[in-house]
Each structure stands twice: as C-alpha cells, then as structure tokens.
C-alpha cells in the first residue's frame, strides 16, 4: 500500500510538472512573440521550473527540455552562467578564453572538492548525465549547469549567508566576465579595482588590435564608473565603436529557421521575404587593380608545327616569358627568341595578334602564333607544318558546314523528307532563320581563314626553298665562324676547397663554353665567367657561399697565390675559394714532438750517443705502455764498438730518452718543434725534421693539468720542461737569452716542468717567470750556435774530408779516455770546411723559452698561444673559455685561466688539445671608425675609353644600398666595378682626394689601360699569352710522357686514413747517383742547346739579347764574389748589408742520406694482394679502401682498417687487363691521378676511376703486382699507351704524338651536316670543341687518327692549341724536346722584341743599358727585408720588384733614399754617380777645415747641383752616359743601388719609422719615470699624513684682541704641516707636467707606410662635426623627406639639393614651425628641417591653396580666353565718397 501510494504521488507530481511546463511555454510565447530565445526570456523559465518543482520528480520530457535548453544556451551564449545572481563559490573562476570552469576554492569549507560536490548533487536528487557522472577525477570539469548552482543555492543557505557577510567585508572589486564587443565567443574573466585597469586587462586578454576604450553592460548601457557594473556581470568591451548586440544575429537566425521548411525537393525559403542581391566585397576600382590581365598564347618549338603549348602570360617581362616557355616546353637550353609566322623577332609580347575567330577554342581569346628559339634562326618548316594542319582542319569544317547549310535550305524548299538532321525538324521558323545566318557567317569565316593561310604559305615559299637547299645550316646563318688562329680554352676539372680547409673537396667541371665570350682572348671576361660557374656549383654545398654575391670571390692555389688568369689553371688542380678574405693555409701550426732513433758506440770508458736510422717495423708502436722514459741514456743498452759512420749527430747523454720495453736496444729521443698540423686529421708536416723521424698521431696533443704541467698525450710519463741555456739572435741584430725546450720524465716537485698561463696569452715558466714560450720563426730569430750543443754533419764533405773526420773522431775518443769528465766533443780544427747549416738541430729551432717582449713589440704575437681542442673526448670544451676577443670563439680556441688570472673551474680537467702559436690577442680590439666623406660629383668613363665626351656624371659616395652598383649599371660594365683611376693612371683609394667634376676611369679589376695605347700592342700581348699557354701544354707533355717505373707507397705514417701515392721505388735508389751526373751535364748544356736551336729563327739583335740574358742567368749569383769588397763610403748601413748578403746564399735543402731514406721508405712501398685485399706489409691490419658510402669516380684511396665484410676494400685483379676493380662497383678501378703539376716529394695520388677499356690512353689504370718483392708497379703498359695517356692529361692532340697511324684510343666523333661523313677527334680536341658540335663518345675498339693533325683538316678545327698548328707540332718520342726548345726560343724572341719596342719610347734602346744591381725595399719599411734584383730595363725592374717584394698591386713608382723619383734606369745610374761624388766631396770638406762663409752655405744648400756641374761639365750630359769613363762607372755600380718601391703612394723616408719608434720609446720612458716619481711622492704624502694623525698632538690656543674671535686654534694633528704643503705643490706640478706630455703624445702623427689616414686622438665626449638631419621640401610633408649630412650650412644645403633632386639650389632652412635657421649651432642631430629654394616658409595647406589659385587662373584663361584675366581693380564708390568727405 505504501508503495502504491508513493507511485500515485509520483504520478501526481508528473502531471503537475507537465502543467508547469505548459505554463512555462505559454510564458515563453507571451514574452517572446516572435519565437526567439534570449537571455532575458530564458531567465524566468529557469526560475519558474526550478523554484516550483524538484528535479527528482520531473518527467523525462521536462528533463529533456531543460537539458536541450541548457545545452543550446551553453553553445550559443558562451560558458558563463545565465543568471547573474547564481551562487558561485569565491574561488571559482574562468581561465582566459577557456571553456572549463574550475572547482571552488579549496581553502574554504563550503565545497571541499569535486567529489563532495558531486555527492551533494546526487543526494539532492540533481540529475547529472552518465558521461559526466562517470568521468575520472583527473579529467577537467566541464561547464557547470545553472540547475546545479540553483540546487546548491537551495541546499546551502547557511553557506550563502557566510558568503554575503564576507562580501560585505571585502573592498569594492570589479569582477566581471568580459566579452569582445559583438561576440560571445571571445571572453575572459577579469578582476580589477578600477575601470582603467579593466580596460588594460581586457586589451591584453581579449587580444584586441587596439586599446580598449569603452565598457558596455548586457543591455547596451555604457559603464563609466565601477559602481555602474554589477558583481559577476557580463560586460562588452569595445575599442571605441558603439555597442553591438551579440544576440541580434542569433535572433535573426532563429526567425529565419522558423520560416524555413524542409520538403522533398530540399530547403524551401519563405516566399514573402524578398531575397536581396549579393553585394561583392571588393569595389570596382579594386577589382580592376587586382584582376590579372593575362592572355593565352599558342607556342611551338622552332621547326615544329604540332604539339603546341597554350601558355597563359600576364604583364611580365620578356625574360620571364622566355623562362616560362623553357620550363613548360621542357627545353634542354634556355629559350632566347620568339618568332612570328614570317620569322620576325617578337620584342613585345602584348602585340601578338589574335587567331582567327574560327580557330578559337575557348571563351578566353587565343593569341599566336609564336615559335620559340634557343638561339638559332627561324625555321619556316614549322610554320609550313602548322599551316598544312590548319588547312586540313578548315577544309573538313567547311565541308561539314556546307552540308549542314544544304540541310537548312531543304526546309525552305519544303523538302523535309530529304532532311537527315533531326534537330532541324524540331526548329521553329525563327530558330531556323537564326541558325541559317550563323552557318552562313561560319562558312564565310572559314573561307576567309583558308585564303589567309594559303597566303601565308605562299609568302613562306622563298624561305622554305632556302632551308631545303642549305639543310640544317640555314638556322645558324647568324653565327660567325671564329678566325683560324683563335681557340677558346679546353675543359678543366678543378678540385675546390673552402679557404682554410683541406677537406670537403668539391669537383667543378669547366667547359669551353663556360669560359667562352664574344672575344675569347679577353682573360678578364673569362675569369668572371669562371668565378660565376664555380659560385653556381657551390650553391647548396658545404662551403655555402653568401647569397648571390660573387663579386668578392677570390681563388688561390696551393702556394697561396691568387689566381687571376684562367689560362694558368690546369686539369685536376686544387684551388681554394674565398669570399673577400685573404688566403688561409689549410695546415695549422702547432707544438709537437719529433722522435728520432738513437744509437751509441763506446771505446773504453767513454760512450757517445748519436742519431741513426729508424727501423719502422720496431718503432711504429704508439702507446704509453710500450715505452719507458729514462733519465739519461739507458744503462742496459748494448753499445757497439764499430767504426764511426760517415755522418752522425751527437746527442747529450744526460737527456731523457724513450726505451722500448720489448726491445731495450730501441731507444728514441724526442725533440720539441713546431709543425704544420691539420685539425681535421692526423696529417702533419714537421718544419724541423732533422733526421728521418716518425710522428705519432697524438705527438702534437698535450694534456694541461691544474698543477701547471704540460704532459704529452703520446707519452704521458713525459712532460714539457726547460733545457740548457741558449742565445737567440733576432732579425734586427739584437741578442736574447733563452732556454731550449725538451721532453723530460715528470716530477711533481720540479718547477722547471711547471708552467703558468697568463692573462695575456703567454705561457710563463714557473722557474723563470720572466721567460715565456716563444715561436722563433715568427720572431725571425736564429739560435747562436756558439752557445748550444755541438753536432757534426759531414754529409756534404768530400771523401778526403770524410776520412779526416773519421780519424779525428777516433782521436777524440782516445784523448777522452784520460778525461772522464768530458761531456762534449771538442770542435775540430777544420770547422771552416763544414758547410753552413751543419749545426742543424739548434740552428733550426722553431720554439724556445725567451725573455718576455714588450706588449707593443711588433713581434709580440710570437709569444701568444692558444689551445685548440683535439680528439673525440670532452667535446665542446672551448665553450667554457672566457676570453674577451670574439675571434677566439670563432676559431674554437680556449684558455685555461679567467681574465682575473684564476683557473677556470668550468673546464673538465685535464684539458686536452694542441698548442697553437701566434694566437689573436685575448682582449677585444678597438675599432676606430673613419670620418665620413662628403658627397663628390664625378665624371666616370670605362677603362680605356678614348672619347671623353662619353663620360657620365654620378654622385659619390652614395649612402643608398645600391652605391656599389652605380658605375656598374650606368657604364654597363660586364662585371662589378672594382678599381678607380685618374687621368694619369694613378689608382684612387679615397674619394676625399678628388675634386668636383674630376674625370675618373672605372675598371672591373684590371689594371689601367692607357687610352693612347694602340690596338696593335694589345694584340701582341694577347698573342704572346696564347703562345705561352700552348707551350705550357707541350712542356707538361714533355715532363710526363716518359714516365719512369713508379710503385705504390704510403705518403705519411702507416695509420688508418693515410693517403696513397706512386713514387720512385727504393730498389733503384742506388742508380740515382749514377744518373744524376749526366742530368746535371745535360742541364748545363740546355742553354747552349736553346741558343743553337734558336739561332736558326732569331736575328742577330735578338741573339745578342739571348746571350746577355744567359750570361746573367747561368751564374745566378755572380756578383757575390765581389759583394764583400765594399768601400767605407758605402751608402747602406753595415748591418743591413751583412744580413742581406748572408741571406742571398742559396739555401741548401736538407735531404736524408740514401741509406736512411731507403730504410724509411721500404715499409711504405710493400703491399700484398691476398684474399681480394691489398694489405700493407708493415701493418697487416690496414688495407687499401675507399671511405664514404657514396662512391664516385675521383675519390682518393686511403688505408682503412681491415674488415671481413667491407666491400669498399676488396679488389678484383684482372691480369689480362692489368687492372684492379672494386668489388662494390666493378666499373671503378684503381688508378693514378695524373695532375698537371706533379709533386716530386709526394708523387701522384692514387684514386678510383671509371674503367677505360681502351688499348691506349689508360696507362694510369694499369698495374703489375710483383709478388716476390711485394710491390705494386704503376703505369705497367707500353710506351705508346703512356704517351697517349700523357697527351690526354696535358691537353695535347694525339696526332702530334703518333704520325699517320690509327690506334685504339678514347675520343669523340660527329657527323657532317649531310650525315654521310663521320669525323673523329681525340680526347683533347674533343674537349676543346665539345660545346660547338654534337659530339658523341667513341666506343672502344675503333682505331682512328685525330682529324686535327691531318693536312686535309678544316680551318675551324684548330685543335687544343690557341696559336700553334697541330699539324706542325711533332711530339714523337725523339723530337718532343726539340719541338719544345724551338717554341720556347720563339717565345723568347718575340718577348725580346716586344720589350725593345716598349722601351724605345724613352729615347734610347733597352739593349744599350747595361744591367744594374739594385737592392729594392718596400716604401715605408726602411732598410728591412731588402731584395737583390738585377735588371736591364725599367719595366723589368718594376715587374721583379712587384714579385719579390710581394706587393699587393703592381709597382709604379721608384724613389732613392733622398726621395728623388726615378723613371728610367739612366736616371738611377746618374743619381748613383751624383751620390758617390757627393760623399767624396763631403769627406774632403771634413778634412779641409775651411772657415764658414757665405759661399759654403750656398754649396751646402745645393751640393748636388755643384757636383753634377763638376762631373758633367766637359764630357757628359744628362741624356747620355757615353762620356763617362767605363772603369769609373763599373767601380761605382759594383755595389747595388738602394731604391724604395711604392704602388703609387708618396715617398716615406727610410729612417722615419725608426725615428717615430725611437721618439715614442723615449716618451714612454719619460712618462714612466714621471709616474714612478709621482707614485713615490704620493706614498710619501700618505706616510706624512699617517704620522701626523697617529701622533694626535694637541692644538695651541692663541689669544687675540678681536672681540669676535678672542681665541685662535693653531697647530694640532688636524692641520697640515709645512712639509706636506710643499709636497702637495710638487705633486700638482708633476701631474700638470704629466698631462702636458700626454697631450703632446696625442698630437703626434707617426708616418706609417701602409696607412694614408693619420692616427687622430678620439675623444669620447667630443661630438663629430658632421650632423645628420631629416629634410623635406618647403610646402611638403615631413614624411616624404630623407636624410642629409653636412659639416657646415653650405655643405648641408648642397647635400639637400642633390638628395631632394631640387630644380634650383637650396638657399634657406626652416624649422617645422617656420623659424629660419641661421647658425650651424642651431642644428641638432636628427633634427627635422624644411628646405627652401629661396621662398618663404609654406605649410602644405598654403602650398595647396597656391596651387589651386594657379589652377583656377589657368582654367579661366583656357575656358574664357586670355582677356578673362585682364582684371582692373578700382575702389568702390562708397570708399571714394568717404575719402572725399574726409578731404
């Protein structure tokens, strides 16, 4: 019963709920008659339902209605609650722009957590959906329902009471939900105290594009005060616009949905509402601007009439259209020209006509026709093909149209039974008539088009006939054939490296077309093309060039010489590319160890240790565990008593040695030296390889410990230590004390093994703090041999001397038996017979411990060091270094101490790395900015231009970004402008030296071309250059065609990664000595042979030149015999002469003895071929292989570690072809890379190369494995094969090697134009003309003779030579050397003639001038680094000076020591005569003590004139030297004449630099003394003050008669004593004197040769004179202005005129307010200035009014005539009457 009652009760409640819901819907309809829902409407619904009905008793329909309404409102109106008074806990809130609401504040007890909140809701019978009820606790809580808040409100009334009390206690806070104006989706919760902060927060949180300015409530009312905003209200924030109702769009949308119905046919819109027309977003003007005016054009390939391409072309340049056609039509070359139907070139794409209307196939009109050419001429066959196809199509359409027209006529004739087209029968009469007119019009159009195309075909008749007669040559009529004597250089294969690196090789192929130009003889243009080609190839590579700027690109060879002529490049040459920077060697200097084998022999109790040969098999055991460091020579060494060897080098027995633990008889001695090391690998080349030595891979790596020890990474038991004292002689003659560096066994308490790293980059010795580690080679210092150990080296003595040396050593040992304390061998009695340089180890020391130099010493960098990380362990160590100079981080250098001098604890100690000398300064260099120049107007001309009227005016320097391209673009130069010259040919470096409107010549980098020079002389120079290039090819062939037997060997150490090469075998080394003498005799006979060979083709005049040159060149230093017989009156300093003539001695290169070299190389040349691998016999774990996954031809073969599965290290030996094929790629074989410049030391490198299956021309791929001696012999082939291979690599035609014989060789072929004859070319000829003809490579097995060498060759087949004819060159085995000598003599003859003609302009022939000995110095260097030059002509003197002095540009000026400019050798000889007589007269004047009178003063003022008059009074004039006694001239000219050479800069006296340095040093010493005295006086002052204060003596009271101050205090400890007062005055006087000295120092301007701008003192607080301002025209807007610079008002006015492009010069300046500027002081930096041409100040508004007045005036005169403006103004009658009354 109870259950039934409960059910009845529930049913009653359900009925009541339905009734309540019905009432709610009625309320809804009444409140919203339009059926829309908004926030105000839904509010009473929720209140009505939730207040009167518990949700537990709601029916399912009611719950569904509430949930649907809730979800709808949630999605439409945002996440905020609908009722503003809903209960929300204090901690609840919304994150910015979030759709989730967080739980309530956990710090309060109202709602503890989310679980309690859910349980309360469940107990209160508030229904929650299953998806939300079953959500995990960690998931974010969704938007809370309004029903849940309401239930919470009913449930916890007590909590609400507490909450309201809390609100009463809190201050007034604006807590709202802010929405973007007009939106309900972009919102944020904001809590702020004021309206201003509310606007700021809303600007940031709502991401408004402008600052928030206004706040609106939900009803649209604007809130101005915080009290206007209710708590927890919804507000709308705008940026200034009025309120936008966000519900308006929703309301309209709901209204539209109400009136729209769904039907079976789709959506039905209301019929009573008129649909408005859709308005476009863009305006008509914007549509015109944005729409793309493009046309469709029909393109065909040249010579084709089918497969056309319709390409849409817009308003683009012709170049872009050509590029589009190249891509769309898939052309193999870029498109160059467009031709129309008649073969005319199209220059404007917009003028292409439309096709006939009947040929249009779309609504968009089609234009055409155009034929695309790749550079060839127009081919009419393509137009013919197209017209024939069009005519065929037109005839078919005309036939069908006429047939259809007949069908239409049958209707008119009422013959419907004959009509076959059913469409016609269904037409009405009107449609029939219209169709008949259209078909008739179509027939007329077709007939007209047919007639037009037939006419086109008739006009093409002559062109078609010419093409049929001339075949394919018709389209190449515009190409002119080159003369027979010109030839573009052949192809090159270059190996490009990045500057400063020797890895990352990039192979670049350069063909003849890449270097070709309209004038092939222009090397400058070819160089530009070469740079561009290399730059394009490097794009995207590891070198990564910056952008497209290749104007600063520079190329260098292996020697660091810049490459400026592409003709000097050779195939397979290595080059280094740089972008604007100087050459950096890929090998870097580092401190390392060199190990030498040591042996000993004993006789009696005396033992002598000496260096001997190394046994590589025993020594190559790197690692600390195999060696032990011994202090002194090992005792357990088995000494020998054999005879002393012919040459030996003694080693001190007290040194530390390395002894092998396995074999005690293997003892090594380590030497410390500087070597060249590659950071990228273990490759090294020691600079001081005294004896054959072995460098371990880690011999240059050191470990720096915290205690200051520097340990060797190779031998960790040994450390860097101080050796015996030495004395070092610097280049300037000064002697420095020092100590030798050695490797010792480490001891923790030894200070001589500890080092201190300073904050200046120096490494100090702890035992001798005043000495630092020094790189001697940079210091240009040599070790004084008298203070070092003694070494004997008899290798260069004769046999008698060797025997004497052996006996002498035996005597030494016998005499030493009685003296056990003797430690060093005595010096032999005949040491003067020993060759210079025999004291080799200490004489060539590269590093030592030397006394610290001054900080400003020019060679101070020799004592700076850096640590370069090496190895794979501890990477990134350099990042912990703390050095101010950013260059250290760029070079990844590190230093172990901080700038404060403390150890850097951030390092992972010990530090491992290389010790690099000559490091950059540790402090950041101070960059001085140069003063900006004022703009100068110049007239520019292209280099060599003769017509000065073609000059163009420019303004320079321009500040715009395009300033560098001004001259390039205006003069239309082929490449970027780089150098400037004046009218006299002097190069310009600074524009400040130029005058206004001065004429300047612009070049692209080449030297100045004299406009007066004849073209014939230029052609002669070009001919000589081409002839030299041809002779160079022949010379390369002659040096390589007789390739001797070469074997495979390892270049450096036998370690993994070592490179391989082919070199002379050690087995035939004994024969070299026998071969040497005949070669020397042959070399001595060569000049005679050359002279005899040239006598047939040279005239007597040139033969005399040749003999004279041979006399000077054969005895290279013939003048040295008399070089020491100088007179006392010599003009050069004695020290300079001594150093100079000592350096002239030829430097003898140290070479190892034959026996030692044989043992050293024997293991490097032994290999075994076993199990498909080529194994090193010395190290069986290493085999030949190729590194890298991507195999390609040209990769180097190196030693790699042996692996069983390595396919890149297995080879297949094919004995029939004598080749070794790589297993991973059988097309690649082991080959020798035949570079054109063979390295005699390293030989030819070994690479993998694509297999060439030819009988001849592939000798570098043929090998012979000699199993008995374990050697691989290269070039194992016939002599003919070697000669053809050498010819191919030298670029010589093979027909000059073999005469009238067909052989199998690599080559090319091409077909004749008629396709009947096949022409065959060799490899060199084919590469030289590959781009001109369609060459195809010949298959193997086709014997042929190159067509270039036959007598029936065509004129254009010049071959690989530029000048020489291939048919006239005979390079067969026995005539190659004679041919080379013949052409060399011919080249020499032509050069002599050219030099003679060039020197004839001075009035006397060059042959009449005797060669003069000259000492050349660089201008500004004083007497440093002089070079001896013997020259016969002045141009030869300038050339030699440029090369030997290493000048950056060509030498152009020569000065003597007194500044006299020299222009010819005759002037130099005359000056030398004058100088010699001047010195003799001065000596006589000193001897004759005459009274000083007026005459003597006059003579002293001009002594040279007096001597000249005395010398040449009778016998000689200034234009001739014939009258001078030859013996006197020879006596004077026996000593070299000192000259100073410059590149155009003015003369600097030789002693100016020394004087400046001396004066600076004196000032420094003087200032140091003053500072020391000042410090002493200040210290004394402090002492006096301290004593006075410490004494605390009381003051005395002295009575006075003054009533104001009856007692005066005197004395006491607070008053200064008289001594202190005097000392203070002295201190002030000294400080004033010091400031005067410093001020004088700042004003001194030292002359420096390399700088043109004097060093000026820079003051931090002094503003520069030049000011930058913002200028604009008078009457204009300031925004339209620009910047201007100036030092004065006049200069600023001039700059304003040029920058604003004013029609008249600027005359007045105003401020923006209209105030005139009169003084320069009124102008400030970045000031806005109005510029006027003389008129008064005008604002933009006034200027506009003035323009309107002028426009009205002109309009009236145009419309009503000139008389309309003839206005006479007269006073009014009223004014006249008033004036009359007044009178």
UniProtKB/Swiss-Prot annotation:
GO CC entries: cytoplasm; Flemming body; microtubule; midbody; mitotic spindle
GO BP: cell division; intracellular signal transduction; regulation of mitotic cytokinesis
Location of the region described as Disordered in the Swiss-Prot/TrEMBL record: 93-133, 860-880
InterPro entries the UniProt entry points to: DCDC1, DCX2_DCDC1, Doublecortin_dom, Doublecortin_dom_sf, Ricin_B-like_lectins
Domain Ricin B-type lectin: 702-800, 1151-1266
Principal subcellular localisation of the protein: other
Alphabetically ordered keywords of this record: Cell cycle, Cell division, Cytoplasm, Cytoskeleton, Lectin, Microtubule, Mitosis, Repeat
Biased composition, class Low complexity, residue ranges: 117-131
Subcellular location field: Midbody, Midbody ring; Midbody; Cytoplasm, Cytoskeleton, Spindle
Pfam families according to UniProt: DCX2_DCDC1, Ubiquitin_DCDC1
Location of the Doublecortin domain: 168-252, 925-1015
Domain of life: Eukaryota
Quaternary structure and partners: Interacts with dynein intermediate chain, tubulin, RAB8A, RAB3IP, NUDC, PAFAH1B1 and DCTN1.
Function description: Microtubule-binding protein which plays an important role in mediating dynein-dependent transport of RAB8A-positive vesicles to the midbody during cytokinesis.
Protein name (database record): Doublecortin domain-containing protein 1
Organism: Homo sapiens
The organism's taxonomic lineage, starting at the top: Eukaryota, Metazoa, Chordata, Craniata, Vertebrata
Gene name of the record: DCDC1
């Amino acid at each position: 019963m109870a259950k039934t009652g409960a059910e009845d009760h529930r049913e009653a409640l359900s009925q009541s709920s339905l009734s309540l819901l019905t009432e709610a819907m009625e309320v809804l309809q009444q409140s919203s008659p339009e059926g829309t829902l908004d926030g105000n409407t839904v509010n009473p619904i929720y209140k009505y339902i939730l207040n009167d009905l518990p949700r537990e008793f709601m029916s399912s329909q009611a719950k569904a209605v509430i949930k649907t309404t809730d979800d709808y409102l949630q999605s439409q109106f945002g996440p905020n609650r609908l009722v503003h008074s809903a209960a929300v806990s204090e901690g609840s809130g919304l994150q910015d722009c979030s759709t989730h609401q967080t739980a309530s504040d956990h710090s309060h007890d109202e709602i503890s957590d989310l679980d309690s909140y859910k349980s309360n809701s469940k107990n209160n019978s508030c229904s929650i959906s299953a998806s939300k009820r079953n959500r995990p606790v960690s998931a974010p809580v969704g938007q809370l329902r309004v029903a849940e808040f309401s239930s919470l409100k009913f449930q916890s009334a007590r909590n609400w009471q507490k909450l309201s009390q809390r609100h009463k206690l809190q201050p007034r806070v604006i807590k709202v939900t802010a929405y973007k104006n007009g939106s309900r989706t972009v919102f944020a919760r904001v809590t702020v105290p004021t309206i201003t902060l509310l606007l700021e927060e809303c600007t940031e949180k709502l991401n408004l594009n402008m600052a928030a300015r206004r706040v609106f409530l939900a009803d649209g009312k604007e809130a101005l005060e915080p009290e206007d905003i209710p708590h927890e209200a919804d507000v709308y924030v705008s940026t200034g616009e009025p309120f936008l109702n966000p519900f308006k769009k929703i309301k309209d949308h709901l209204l539209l949905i109400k009136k729209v119905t769904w039907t079976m046919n789709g959506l039905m819109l209301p019929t009573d509402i008129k649909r408005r027309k859709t308005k476009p977003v863009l305006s008509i003007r914007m549509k015109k601007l944005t729409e793309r005016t493009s046309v469709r054009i029909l393109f065909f390939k040249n010579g084709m009439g089918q497969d056309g391409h319709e390409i849409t072309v817009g308003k683009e340049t012709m170049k872009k259209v050509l590029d589009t056609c190249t891509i769309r039509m898939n052309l193999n070359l870029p498109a160059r020209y467009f031709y129309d139907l008649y073969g005319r070139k199209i220059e404007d794409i917009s003028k292409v006509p439309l096709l006939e209307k009947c040929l249009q196939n779309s609504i968009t009109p089609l234009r055409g026709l155009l034929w695309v050419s790749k550079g060839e001429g127009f081919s009419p066959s393509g137009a013919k093909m197209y017209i024939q196809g069009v005519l065929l199509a037109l005839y078919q359409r005309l036939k069908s149209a006429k047939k259809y027209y007949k069908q239409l006529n049958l209707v008119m004739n009422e013959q419907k039974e004959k009509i076959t087209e059913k469409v016609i029968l269904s037409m009405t009469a009107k449609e029939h008539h219209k169709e008949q007119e259209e078909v008739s019009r179509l027939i007329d159009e077709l007939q007209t088009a047919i007639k037009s195309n037939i006419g086109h075909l008739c006009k093409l008749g002559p062109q078609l006939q010419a093409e049929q007669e001339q075949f394919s040559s018709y389209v190449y009529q515009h190409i002119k054939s080159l003369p027979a004597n010109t030839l573009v250089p052949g192809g090159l294969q270059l190996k490009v490296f990045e500057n400063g690196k020797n890895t990352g090789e990039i192979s670049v192929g350069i063909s003849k077309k890449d270097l070709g130009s309209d004038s092939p003889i222009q090397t400058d243009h070819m160089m530009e093309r070469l740079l561009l080609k290399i730059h394009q190839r490097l794009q995207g590579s590891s070198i990564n060039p910056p952008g497209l700027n290749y104007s600063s690109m520079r190329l260098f060879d292996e020697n660091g010489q810049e490459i400026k002529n592409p003709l000097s490049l050779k195939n397979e040459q290595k080059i280094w590319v740089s972008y604007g920077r100087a050459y950096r060697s890929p090998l870097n200097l580092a401190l390392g160890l060199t190990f030498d084998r040591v042996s000993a022999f004993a006789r009696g109790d005396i033992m002598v240790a000496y260096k001997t040969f190394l046994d590589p098999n025993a020594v190559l055991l790197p690692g600390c565990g195999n060696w032990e460091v011994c202090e002194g020579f090992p005792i357990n060494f088995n000494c020998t008593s054999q005879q002393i060897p012919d040459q030996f080098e003694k080693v001190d027995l007290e040194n530390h040695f390395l002894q092998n633990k396995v074999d005690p008889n293997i003892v090594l001695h380590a030497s410390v030296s500087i070597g060249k090391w590659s950071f990228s690998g273990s490759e090294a080349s020691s600079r001081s390889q005294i004896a054959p030595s072995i460098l371990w891979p880690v011999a240059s790596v050191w470990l720096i410990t915290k205690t200051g020890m520097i340990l060797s990474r190779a031998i960790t038991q040994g450390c860097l230590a101080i050796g015996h004292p030495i004395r070092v002689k610097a280049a300037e003659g000064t002697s420095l004390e020092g100590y030798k560096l050695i490797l010792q066994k480490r001891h923790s308490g030894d200070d001589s093994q500890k080092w201190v790293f300073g904050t200046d980059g120096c490494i100090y010795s702890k035992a001798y703090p005043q000495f630092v580690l020094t790189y001697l080679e940079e210091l240009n210092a040599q070790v004084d041999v008298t203070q070092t150990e003694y070494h004997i080296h008899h290798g260069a003595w004769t046999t008698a001397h060797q025997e004497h040396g052996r006996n002498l050593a035996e005597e030494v040992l016998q005499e030493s038996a009685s003296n056990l304390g003797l430690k060093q061998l005595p010096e032999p009695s005949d040491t003067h017979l020993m060759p210079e340089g025999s004291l080799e180890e200490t004489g060539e020391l590269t590093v030592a411990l030397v006394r610290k130099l001054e900080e400003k010493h020019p060679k101070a960098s020799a004592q700076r060091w850096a640590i370069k990380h090496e190895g794979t362990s501890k990477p990134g160590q350099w990042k912990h270094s703390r050095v101010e100079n950013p260059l250290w981080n760029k070079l990844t250098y590190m230093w172990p101490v901080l700038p404060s001098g403390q150890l850097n604890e951030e390092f992972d100690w010990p530090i491992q790395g290389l010790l690099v000398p000559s490091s950059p300064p540790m402090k950041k260099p101070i960059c001085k900015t140069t003063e900006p120049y004022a703009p100068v107007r110049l007239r520019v001309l292209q280099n060599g231009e003769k017509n000065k009227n073609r000059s163009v005016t420019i303004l320079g320097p321009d500040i715009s970004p395009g300033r560098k391209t001004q001259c390039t673009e205006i003069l239309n130069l082929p490449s970027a402008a780089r150098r400037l010259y004046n009218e006299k040919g002097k190069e310009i470096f600074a524009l400040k030296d130029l005058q206004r409107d001065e004429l300047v010549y612009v070049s692209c980098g080449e030297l100045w071309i004299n406009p007066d020079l004849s073209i014939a002389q230029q052609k002669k120079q070009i001919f000589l250059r081409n002839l030299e290039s041809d002779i160079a090819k022949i010379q390369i062939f002659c040096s390589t065609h007789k390739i001797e037997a070469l074997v495979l060997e390892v270049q450096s150490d036998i370690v993994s990664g070592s490179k391989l090469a082919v070199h002379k075998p050690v087995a035939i080394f004994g024969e070299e000595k026998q071969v040497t003498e005949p070669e020397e005799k042959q070399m001595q006979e060569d000049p005679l042979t050359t002279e005899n060979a040239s006598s047939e083709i040279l005239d007597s005049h040139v033969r005399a030149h040749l003999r004279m040159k041979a006399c000077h060149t054969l005895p290279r230093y013939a003048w040295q015999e008399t070089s020491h017989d100088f007179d006392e009156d010599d003009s050069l300093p004695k020290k300079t002469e001594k150093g100079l003539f000592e350096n002239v001695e030829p430097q003898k290169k140290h070479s190892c003895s034959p026996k030692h070299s044989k043992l050293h190389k024997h293991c490097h040349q032994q290999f075994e071929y076993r199990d498909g691998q080529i194994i090193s016999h010395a190290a069986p774990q290493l085999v030949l292989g190729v590194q890298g996954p991507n195999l390609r031809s040209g990769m180097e073969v190196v030693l790699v570690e042996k692996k069983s599965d390595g396919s890149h290290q297995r080879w297949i030996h094919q004995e029939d072809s004598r080749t070794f094929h790589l297993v991973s790629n059988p097309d690649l074989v082991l080959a020798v890379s035949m570079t054109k410049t063979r390295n005699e030391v390293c030989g030819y490198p070994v690479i993998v190369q694509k297999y060439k299956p030819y009988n001849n021309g592939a000798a570098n791929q043929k090998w012979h494995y000699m199993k008995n001696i374990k050697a691989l012999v290269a070039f194992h082939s016939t002599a003919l094969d070697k000669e053809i291979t050498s010819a191919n690599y030298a670029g010589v035609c093979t027909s000059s090697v073999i005469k009238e014989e067909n052989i199998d060789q690599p080559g090319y072929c091409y077909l004749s134009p008629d396709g009947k004859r096949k022409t065959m070319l060799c490899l060199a000829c084919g590469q030289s003309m590959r781009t001109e003809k369609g060459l195809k490579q010949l298959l193997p097995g086709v014997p042929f003779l190159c067509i270039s060498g036959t007598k029936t060759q065509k004129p254009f087949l010049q071959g690989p030579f530029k000048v020489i004819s291939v048919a006239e060159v005979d390079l067969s085995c026995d005539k190659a050397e004679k041919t080379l000598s013949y052409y060399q003599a011919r080249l020499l003859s032509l050069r002599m003639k050219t030099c003679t003609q060039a020197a004839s302009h001075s009035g006397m022939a060059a042959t009449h001038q005797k060669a003069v000995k000259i000492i050349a110095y660089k201008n500004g260097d004083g007497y440093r680094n002089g070079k001896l030059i013997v020259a016969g002509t002045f141009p030869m003197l300038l050339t030699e000076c440029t090369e030997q002095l290493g000048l950056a540009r060509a030498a152009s000026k020569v000065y003597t020591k007194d500044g006299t400019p020299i222009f010819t050798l005759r002037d130099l000889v005359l000056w030398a005569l004058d100088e010699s007589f001047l010195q003799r007269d001065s000596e006589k004047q000193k001897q004759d003590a005459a009274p000083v009178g007026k005459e003597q003063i006059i003579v002293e003022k001009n002594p040279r004139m007096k001597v000249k008059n005395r010398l040449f009074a009778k016998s000689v004039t200034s234009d001739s030297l014939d009258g001078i006694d030859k013996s006197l001239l020879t006596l004077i000219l026996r000593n070299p004449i000192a000259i100073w050479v410059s590149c155009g800069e003015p003369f600097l006296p030789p002693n100016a630099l020394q004087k400046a340095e001396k004066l600076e040093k004196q000032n420094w010493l003087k200032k140091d003394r003053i500072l020391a005295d000042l410090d002493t006086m200040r210290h004394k002052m402090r002492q006096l003050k301290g004593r006075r204060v410490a004494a605390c003596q009381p003051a005395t009271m002295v009575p006075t008669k003054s009533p104001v101050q009856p007692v005066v205090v005197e004395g006491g400890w607070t008053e200064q004593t008289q001594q202190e007062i005097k000392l203070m005055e002295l201190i002030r006087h000294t400080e004033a004197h010091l400031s005067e000295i410093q001020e004088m120092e700042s004003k001194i301007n030292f002359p420096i040769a390399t700088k043109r701008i004097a060093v000026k003192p820079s003051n931090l607080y002094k503003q520069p004179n030049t000011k930058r301002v913002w200028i604009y025209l008078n009457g204009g807007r300031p925004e339209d202005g620009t910047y201007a610079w100036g030092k004065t008002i006049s200069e600023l006015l001039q700059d304003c005129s040029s920058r604003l492009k004013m029609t008249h010069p600027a005359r007045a300046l105003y401020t923006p307010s209209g105030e005139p500027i009169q003084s320069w002081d009124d102008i400030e930096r970045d000031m806005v200035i109005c510029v006027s041409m003389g008129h008064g100040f005008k604002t933009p508004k006034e200027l506009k009014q003035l323009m309107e007045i002028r426009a009205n005036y002109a309009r009236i005169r145009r419309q009503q005539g000139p008389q309309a403006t003839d206005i006479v103004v007269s006073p009014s009658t009223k004014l006249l009457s008033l004036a009359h009354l007044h009178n």
